[in-house]
């Protein structure tokens, strides 16, 4: 039988012997070590490489190798395409070769620039199961631990670009390396060949979380791997090989699959337009860390984004009813809840990537349609009819219909009093009564003191709400300006699973 010494001494070792890297990107590098345990130096006569197209091996390939000394080797995937099955066999003249094997699948690079005349889109999809009780109470469960993401681009191709791109799409299979063009950044100054660091003029959160980037200028591009980032400085795993001016753009890259179906329109014999959707690989998601700096009320975030008033805000009133319709004769109608549920259709315009990223962070915090938050209504709640001089829990308002507060769950239980000095005061309404002079008296949970009508800009209702759907589709006019349209559903009942003890004092 073999002993440890029989195996260990007078032997040659490779660490590791093989690597299954899965999906890789151009420029990826893999390392291994070779050493031997012979008592005298060993002569390496050569290295035989198979499957080496576009692959470079760096390290000692011949000569005398000292005993018990580790020799480092690096395999660089520079120009490989498709499946990679690379073997490096080390020949020591003993009649048997010692081999290192690398298996991988190279993602196809899609560096072609998109046509911004059709705005590119980035869609983030969560998945929430909503179970609704008879009275409208909801139980919501997030079914994905990570959202899925897709991007949609239009490519306009002319002349030789046309048939090259068409042939590329028609013959490609497997994964692709897709730039997130709307999230591009710019260099603060040019880059020279051999530079191991690049400096950016600005950085998006998605680029900061990337492992691979594309540097593109006109029809030239280079794929670089990120070792680390410190502010606006990016350290590369290996120096770049080309020169780029300050006008070059830096784009985060993601591994994705093209959708099952894409379309092309031939406007001329030499002019095609391709519309393609790419689904990012959900197992290789690289997303920015969530930044939670949102103000809270009753342990729930307050929705901080203002809708674009240049676009109409639509409000839909949904009444929860059970209707028995015999088709002949009278119908039987039963109201499941008191009042209607409002669904607000709002469009939000972002004028910087930082603003849009904050909205994305809020959606992630809510886990799509699962979480609850407070949102301002599009109109006013009511108006004060007189000043508040001394501390009181009651104040008078103009006739508003809030006297139905006890009979309906639809009226907002919280309000935000916005003052001209920029301050916002939150109040919780307990009830409202009618006065003989036509005004109404509102009783609040919090005391109010020294509040003049002339100091109040507006009083808006704060509805408990959630996103009505799990899809967040951002449309980019430029890399800075983007919009999203969302329906936001009012909730009549708070989720008791959310601990209200964490509420801030108002």
Please name every model-derived segment.
Residues 1, 97-232, 236-506:
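Extracellular/virion structural assembly segments
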Residues 2-38, 76-80:
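Beta-sheet-dominated interaction scaffolds and their linkers
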Residues 30, 69-73, 440:
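Short strand-edge motifs at loop-to-beta-strand transitions and within beta-strands
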Residues 39-44:
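Short acidic/proline- and small/hydrophobic-mixed sequence motifs that coincide with surface turns
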Residues 48-65:
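Short, solvent-exposed loop/linker segments at beta-strand-coil boundaries, enriched for Pro/Gly
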Residues 67-81, 86:
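Short, hydrophobic beta-strand segments
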Residues 76, 89-95, 447:
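Beta-strand-rich extracellular modules
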Residues 84-92, 178:
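Serine/threonine-enriched low-complexity regions used as flexible
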